[in-house]
UniProtKB/Swiss-Prot annotation:
This is Protein pp71. Pfam families: Herpes_UL82_83 (PF05784). The lineage of its organism: Viruses, Duplodnaviria, Heunggongvirae, Peploviricota, Herviviricetes. The gene is UL82. Residues 431-440, 543-559 have a biased composition (Low complexity). It comes from Human cytomegalovirus (strain Merlin) (HHV-5). Interacts with the host protein DAXX; this interaction takes place at ND10 and induces the reversal of DAXX-mediated repression of viral transcription. Interacts with UL35. Interacts with host TMEM173/STING1; this interaction inhibits the cGAS/STING pathway. Interacts with host RB1; this interaction mediates RB1 proteasomal degradation.
Length: 559
């Protein structure tokens, strides 16, 4: 018995065509290889009231072949875009590792409620990976003390040390009776610290050759070497001790080694206890004092009594943790300047951050990876809600086409001169900036030139990307796109980024979803992708809120 013929667009043939088209789309989106991913998504799966915060699941996974900093920043709309916190805003996300699922904070700073059918529910982000090369750092550097007026100003308290020469360092053992002095410090959990200093003769240690010290053992767990110095004559080593408990010991035994390191990056003081060393590159920053962010007190400044000195060989960048409802300053840290980070509440509920809770990571990048944008005085850091990234031609960046990145006050309209400048710049720069083509003309057109092996085989895709990267480095095309982080006043070459392997979940695809490829596949655009809203997880309860057992709410805590 023969089957009845079905009309075009109906019946089993049309269903099979739709299924095959969906499978083809899923396969194209399933394995992408690029240097930078541009993701244009439509917010669905719920509503977002004005002035509220929710988590946005972009339904996209990114992977790299080596440990890197995986970043996801909101894309600049134009070269002269400002931080206009009057619309949908995505908080910058930074994760250290080899894979990440893009889940970001979404704030609605606009005056209207966001619904799935609203017009302004489209956001664009850029995802990229920053390489982490091995950078040796001296934790306790032997600084030469400045002139203090003579031998009489040397610390009066001295200690006798036992010094022994080993294969690669000098081992020092000594016992000292510290003369403790109490010093108040509001940035610490205890609010105080006990300090002491003493000196011992270097003996056979050549102070003109050694430059680092490592503490191996101490008789008291709360006592540590904070700083070390040598005198101008090269005869004495001075140690500065810190003790962070209410009762310092009367006698301290120390065992440490003195050696030659010649590190390009050194810490001004001992990183312990608020900077935890990472294996190959950088430190994890721990909160020195617990605090609570509320709607009455939405800001807090974290201070770390330490700094780094790179001798202009590296850039020091701080990447904050992803704490829902909290925005932390991120970006370059200047040399020899105390670390200060502003933490701001962006959600609706109070957030409590504990003592020694990880706040972020500090990593080092060799000088030349980040280039200061022409016309900018210096690299700066910005809160996570103000992190932006853009792709612009190198020639435009070098001639100063990317303007000063300044925050704009919410609710203030731009001046006539700013509007005219933006219109002129848009006409000049939009032609050179790759933008997605219309949906009807670009349906899955971005992969017509790509082979099936490239999409299915990760190694083949990465090899092709590396070959193209080498070709562009040799050619030196000034019209090539660069990754600009206007929030930090820096830009970087796409060739220096770590290649990404991207997979978009099948549930995020829509009939109008499409792909686009630019810069020989270095920039991949996945547009018209569906993303969903999630509720913000309940924050950690603060001691103020847990201490009260009354069911009656209070406007402020009782003092």
């Amino acid at each position: 018995m023969s089957q009845a013929s079905s009309s075009p667009g109906e019946g089993p043939s049309s269903e099979a065509a739709a299924i095959s088209e969906a499978e083809a789309a899923s396969g194209s989106f399933g394995r992408l290889h690029c240097q930078v991913l541009r993701l244009i998504t439509n917010v669905e799966g719920g509503s977002l009231e004005a002035g509220r915060l929710r988590l946005l699941d972009l339904r996209t996974n990114i992977e790299v072949s080596r440990p890197s900093v995986l970043c996801c920043f909101q894309e600049n709309k134009s070269p002269h875009d400002t931080v206009d916190l009057t619309d949908l805003n995505i908080k910058g996300r930074c994760v250290v590792g080899e894979q990440d699922r893009l889940l970001v904070d979404l704030n609605n700073f606009g005056p209207r409620r966001l619904t799935p059918g609203s017009e302004n529910n489209t956001v664009s982000v850029l995802a990229f990976a920053l390489p982490l090369d091995r950078v040796p750092v001296s934790g306790l550097h032997l600084f030469q003390s400045q002139r203090r007026g003579g031998e009489e100003n040397r610390p009066r308290m001295e200690a006798r040390a036992i010094i022994r020469r080993t294969a690669h360092h000098w081992a020092v053992r000594l016992t000292v009776t510290p003369n403790w002095r109490r010093r108040t410090d509001s940035s610490l959990e205890a609010g105080q610290i006990f300090v002491s200093q003493f000196a011992f003769r270097a003996g056979a240690i050549p102070l003109t050759l050694v430059d680092a010290l490592e503490q191996l053992a101490c008789s008291d767990p709360n006592t540590y070497i904070h700083k070390t110095e040598t005198d101008e004559r090269g005869q004495w080593i001075m140690l500065f001790l810190h003790h962070d408990s209410p009762h310092p010991p009367t006698s301290v035994f120390l065992h440490f080694s003195v050696y030659t390191h010649r590190a390009e990056v050194v810490a001004r003081h001992n990183p312990y206890p608020h900077l935890r060393r990472l294996p190959d590159n950088g430190f994890q920053l721990l909160i020195p004092k617990s605090f609570t962010l509320t709607r009455i007190h939405p800001e807090y400044i974290v201070q770390i009594q330490n700094a780094f000195e790179t001798n202009q060989t590296h850039d020091t960048i701080f990447f904050p943790e992803n704490i829902p409802g909290v925005s932390i300053e991120a970006g370059p840290l200047p040399d020899r300047v105390r670390i200060t980070l502003r933490v701001t509440l962006t959600g609706d509920q109070a957030v409590h951050l504990e003592h020694r809770q990880p706040l972020g990571r500090i990593h080092f990048f060799r000088r030349g990876f980040w280039t200061l944008t022409p016309g900018k005085p210096d690299k700066i850091k910005r809160p996570q809600v103000q992190l932006r990234a853009g792709l612009f031609p190198r020639s435009n960046v070098m001639r100063g086409a990317v303007s000063e990145f300044l925050p704009q006050s919410p609710g203030l309209p731009p001046t006539e001169e700013e509007e005219e400048e933006e219109e002129e710049d848009d006409e000049d720069d939009l032609s050179s900036t790759p933008t997605p083509t219309p949906l009807s003309e670009a349906m899955f057109a971005g992969f017509e030139e790509a082979s099936g092996d490239e999409d299915s085989d990760t190694q083949a895709g990465l090899s092709r990307a590396l070959i193209l990267t080498g070709q562009r480095r040799r050619s030196g095309n000034n019209g090539a796109l660069t990754l600009v982080i206007p929030s930090w006043h820096v830009f970087a070459s796409l060739d220096d980024l770590v290649p990404l392997t991207v997979s978009v979940q099948h549930a995020a695809l829509r009939p109008t979803s499409y792909l686009r490829s630019d810069m020989d596949g270095d920039v991949r655009t996945a547009a018209d992708i569906s993303s969903t809203l999630r509720s913000v997880p309940a924050p950690r309860p603060s001691p103020i809120s847990t201490a009260s057992t009354s069911s009656t709410p209070r406007s402020r805590p009782r003092i």
